[in-house]
Amino acid sequence: MGVAVRVIPCLDVAAGRVVKGVNFQNLRDQGDPVEFARRYAEQGADELTFLDVTATVDDRSTTYDVVRATAGQVFIPLTVGGGVRSTEDVARLLGSGADKVGVNSAAIARPGLVAEIADRFGAQVLVLSLDVKRSASTDSGFAVTTHGGRTETGLDALEWAARAIELGAGELLVNSIDADGTKEGFDLELIREMRALSAVPVIASGGAGKTADFAPALRAGADAVLAASVFHSGELTIGDVKTALAAAGMEVRP
């Protein structure tokens, strides 16, 4: 028996509600995150990812409440990212019921944060999120961006991922800005390049549109696949994806 692949729905949460927008702009209310989480757990999700897209510090406490409420009702691993800037933020999220914490722009601004979190809580808690765009300006052809892909950092995505792994990142959440929202499949070259860096688990994100899109991402080297809008809209269920993966010869949890 091999290791089962993971299917992970992602919820963008702002001020305690699930929202949908394009690159964090024009956010529209989609509903209660606890209800979404319960539904996905019932469908067989292996994990859940919450991304806090709240713009203001005032609403951060609402996010902790949402995490607490979700963790009290849903018993699958929960990763929370967005706005994590310190080990204190991580401690509060873990104390609220998160199992793992995602860091992105704060780690780019201060890479030492990765080591601080890993040293205090363990690498297994730390997910490095990367929003990656194809770019001729980097050696690998892939650049790290922030602000939903609108701001280029000048960092080579593969170099940054390798450095973060050295500092203690225990997992990579790799989101293709180019593929995101296209529903035309994941960026397989990007996944292969990230897989070649190390044995650290890779979560592929960006581009899922149909059940046939998921198996190629896993064959390219991803350990898990993440999607948002196709699940929220009801176009696909977690079960649909797992059925397709099992038919493709992959081991999935029920």
UniProtKB/Swiss-Prot annotation:
Protein's UniProt keywords contain Lyase: yes
Pathway in which this enzyme or protein is active: Amino-acid biosynthesis; L-histidine biosynthesis; L-histidine from 5-phospho-alpha-D-ribose 1-diphosphate: step 5/9
Catalysed reaction, written as an equation: 5-[(5-phospho-1-deoxy-D-ribulos-1-ylimino)methylamino]-1-(5-phospho-beta-D-ribosyl)imidazole-4-carboxamide + L-glutamine = D-erythro-1-(imidazol-4-yl)glycerol 3-phosphate + 5-amino-1-(5-phospho-beta-D-ribosyl)imidazole-4-carboxamide + L-glutamate + H(+)
GO molecular function: imidazoleglycerol-phosphate synthase activity; lyase activity
Function: IGPS catalyzes the conversion of PRFAR and glutamine to IGP, AICAR and glutamate. The HisF subunit catalyzes the cyclization activity that produces IGP and AICAR from PRFAR using the ammonia provided by the HisH subunit.
Assembly with partners or alone: Heterodimer of HisH and HisF.
Protein name: Imidazole glycerol phosphate synthase subunit HisF
Taxonomic path: Bacteria, Bacillati, Actinomycetota, Actinomycetes, Micrococcales
